[in-house]
Amino acid sequence: MIESLYSEFEPDITITAKKRKTFDEREINWREIKKCKGVSSFSKGLEEVVVLRHEKKWVNATLIGVESNFLKSIKIKSHLLAGNELFKEKNGAAYGIIGVDLMQKLNAKKGFQSEHEQILIYAPKRNIKIRFGKTPFYSGQIAIAGIMNYNTEINQEKILWPLENARNLLNYSSELSHIYIDVLPKISNDEMKTKIMDVVGDNFVVKTNYEKNELIFKTSKSERLIVIFIMIFIFILASFNLVA
């Protein structure tokens, strides 16, 4: 159960810059990534720590700006508690999908289709000198379309928003912080990791979903082993009682 909740939100492969927070998407040979045998899909991502505000409630969160195909990758429809996966409309209107606990911290409620709850968002400006009378934050509004439920970390900290809108808020143009890759079922993540590393080079870090959540997966396996040992012990005790 624990593994499925983490693995469904975490793409099979994640690429980040080795020594930088962000990188220009033009540094990536997208054609070669597409040509890698076993790549099911990929999505560009931009993650940033932000502050969300609703009325008098202020909460720290992680904004994840992604392309719409990322929602399919994380099986968003199976994890929506309320609302829908509406992300970007043809008229340009954009919507966010927020973790259930984060929504509760803000004391906000999912509105009707015609009146989406509005959340204020603040992100620190980069490389500026703080001066009196000038705000050190970029700011904007996110209309909430859906509430998602995965695991404690996602539920308490994450909010999804279209990549283009996240870039506009953060004053980026072609920067990314992550690339998320889904791998076809018959291809191992470790095998795909090796292929991707050859494409992106030494300036990037490539990790499988297991490597990103290694402690969680190991803990889950340890818990299963403990349960098995307990069951064996109970079975042995029961056998002795029957013999007696």
Please report, for each region that a protein language model flagged, where it lies by residue.
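Basic-flanked hydrophobic alpha-helices used for secretion and membrane insertion
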Residues: 112-203
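Hydrophobic, regular-secondary-structure patches
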Residues: 1-62, 68-92
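Alpha-helix/helix-capping structural signal
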Residues: 47, 69, 101, 164-165
